[in-house]
Amino acid sequence: MFAAIASGNPLQLSVEVPNSNGLQHTIVLSRTKPKLYSHITLFILPNVTFPQDYIATVYFKLSPQEEFKLFGYLSSEKPSAIFKVQIPSSKKDAGDTSDGLGEIDMDVDDGSGAADPFTDTNGSSSNNISELIIGISIEPREQGMMKLEEWKASMNAEAQKNNSLILSRPNLGIIRNITTAGQLAQVYPSLTQELAAKIVQHAYNYLSGFLDAQGNVPIKRFDTWWDKFRNRLANDGTFLDEVTKN
């Protein structure tokens, strides 16, 4: 009923799950060539008439011991889809999951763009991941689409969470949310001192060009420096690395 193909590998047909009344299927993609693949095309076979009131939800996992994870669907109006598989290069990478399954982007329909290949936990190409298991469940359209909407909402919530400012303290493995200058100074005291010194030195370098005969600087010159400093910091904070004593 379904088939999948990965670059450099033969076509694999789906197998009906026993006692599922034809509503559940699996496809096992085993690597048969040394070429690594990162895009998987899944489709309904041309000779199959898929009922319009149903959709086929698509799941992935990397081993029989893992739980299936929802990542998309097929239907009569959408008989095929391309999925991009990205395995994290390290278990500590952002977005890594405990079961080793990395990001699978739903419906990369044009198949364009480079994608990371399968990699081991050291970041090098590896054959340690020998198969990828696709699970397909035929469900009533309303039920399946509701499940997909819930999945999308959870993915969006996770993405927003990952976009927050999170810093880790070296050697302690502590992950903290840094929201104030005081918290930053507590977690990274040496780095905070260096940052403060860079800011003061930048101000000194600028203001020293406006000293009067008594060694004073008009306050408006400081205001001008502060406005320029904030604008430059917003555009590219790395300029602070170049601040040195005059």
UniProtKB/Swiss-Prot annotation:
Belongs to the OPI10 family. Keywords: Cytoplasm, Lipid biosynthesis, Lipid metabolism, Nucleus, Phospholipid biosynthesis, Phospholipid metabolism. It comes from the Eukaryota. Present with 1910 molecules/cell in log phase SD medium. Involved in phospholipid biosynthesis. InterPro entries: Hikeshi-like_C, Hikeshi-like_N, OPI10. It is found in: Cytoplasm; Nucleus. This is Protein OPI10. One of its GO terms (cellular component) is cytoplasm. Signal peptide: none annotated.
